[in-house]
Amino acid sequence: MARTLDGTEISRVMRAEMAQDVAALQAAGVTPGLSVVLVGNNPASQAYVASKTRACESLGMRGQTLTLPEDVSKEALFAVIDRLNADPSVHGILVQLPLPAHLPYKAVLEHIHPAKDVDGFHPVNAGLAFVGDPRAFVPCTPAGIMEMLRREDIPTRGKHVVIVGRSLIVSKPLASLLMAPGPDATVTITHRHTPDLASFTRQADILIVAVGKQNLITADMVKPGVVVIDVGQNRVSDASSPRGYRMVGDVDFDAIQPIASAITPVPGGVGPMTITMLLANTLQAARQTQAR
């Protein structure tokens, strides 16, 4: 039976450590500050943004949300970002995705100054991360997965890591991190056009799935002893839940848990790590500001 990789508990420990670092910065006259820009009133986005600002405040950081109307123009949004870029009390800027269709999300993300891009999506940070520059802000989900593997003493050196999915937000930066000197993993990336997906997933010592499709990975697709990291977030109807739904991952958890050596649950696995690494990146941004 696989041990459960508890992202909630790992996050709790990390946040306690970070709270001490925040207090030390405050003693030096710097309070880390994160500003989140939310366009529109999507309930899921509102809830996610609220959880981010609450997490900031729980550590003694400043967390603020700027809510703009659904029909905000690109120019007006850029003006808000310009103001935040110029504000020395704001160390991290995050524009909550998804954006309305009329806003060019790539241009929006690139308008954030790289030194405040705590989501790690700016091309400058992507390039710095690719070459292993410590100044880079690494996207929060890949960074959280790496931290989870490290803290759970799961070795990656010489291991075959198979990633299902090829997104710029998770899979590609994660592959780069895993192949870097230190982690030293051999990485295979698969995607929707990969023929015979199971022939690849069965080779994995560590299987990371980030697609967004319920039960994509079944028990016959993994080998005994595999470590499974499930990044998927899928909403399924559940009349027994007060909300009328529950969240599940991309992996058939109940079927694979008896086979694997370790596995992340959904919820409570990778998700908490993502928000915690956003806090870590904001703390890093404040430190880098102090050093300049």
From Swiss-Prot:
Entry EC no(s): 1.5.1.5, 3.5.4.9
Binding-site residues, NADP(+): G165, R166, S167
Record has Glycoprotein as a keyword: no
Keywords assigned: Amino-acid biosynthesis, Histidine biosynthesis, Hydrolase, Methionine biosynthesis, Multifunctional enzyme, NADP, One-carbon metabolism, Oxidoreductase, Purine biosynthesis
Catalysed reaction equations from the record: (6R)-5,10-methylene-5,6,7,8-tetrahydrofolate + NADP(+) = (6R)-5,10-methenyltetrahydrofolate + NADPH; (6R)-5,10-methenyltetrahydrofolate + H2O = (6R)-10-formyltetrahydrofolate + H(+)
GO cellular-component term (any): cytosol
Annotated GO biological process: L-histidine biosynthetic process; methionine biosynthetic process; purine nucleotide biosynthetic process; tetrahydrofolate interconversion
Subunit structure: Homodimer.
Name by which UniProt lists this protein: Bifunctional protein FolD 1
Name of the gene: folD1
